[in-house]
Curated annotation (Swiss-Prot):
UniProt name for this protein: Small ribosomal subunit protein uS14
Keyword Ribonucleoprotein on entry: yes
Keywords (A to Z) from UniProt: Ribonucleoprotein, Ribosomal protein, RNA-binding, rRNA-binding
InterPro entries linked: Ribosomal_uS14 (IPR001209), Ribosomal_uS14_bac/plastid (IPR023036), Ribosomal_uS14_CS (IPR018271)
Matching Pfam families: Ribosomal_S14
Gene Ontology terms describing biological process: translation
Functional summary from the UniProt entry: Binds 16S rRNA, required for the assembly of 30S particles and may also be responsible for determining the conformation of the 16S rRNA at the A site.
GO molecular function: rRNA binding; structural constituent of ribosome
Subunit: Part of the 30S ribosomal subunit. Contacts proteins S3 and S10.
Length: 101
């Protein structure tokens, strides 16, 4: 199990990313825009740097919904490999069965 503080930190990152999403997209459009002047680009870069660090979506980490484990995360299920295996063995995931050959 992950520490509660790590799970809470991840929740804060998700909220911040959603809060600043529109502003971040607007600034990035100015930076990558062909018609923007160099001064506008520089101002946009400086404004982007003033945004909170955790508002960037790349700082978010996929975590298991049950345990908070950050590694071996399977996006399709939202769980770690360990919890997917446990659920599959109990037959809780429709259409998923253990391979045998």
């Amino acid at each position: 199990m992950a520490k509660q503080s790590m799970k809470a930190r991840e929740v804060v990152r998700v909220k911040l990313a959603e809060k600043y999403r529109a502003k971040r997209e607007e600034l990035k459009a100015i930076i990558s825009g062909v018609n923007s002047s160099d001064e506008d680009r520089w101002d946009a870069v400086l404004k982007l740097q003033t945004l909170p660090r955790d508002s960037s979506p790349s700082r978010q980490r996929n975590r298991c919904r049950q345990t908070g484990r950050p590694h071996a995360f399977l996006r399709k299920f939202g769980l770690s490999r360990i919890k997917v295996r446990e659920a599959a063995m109990r037959g809780e995931i429709p259409g998923l069965k253990k391979a045998s050959w």
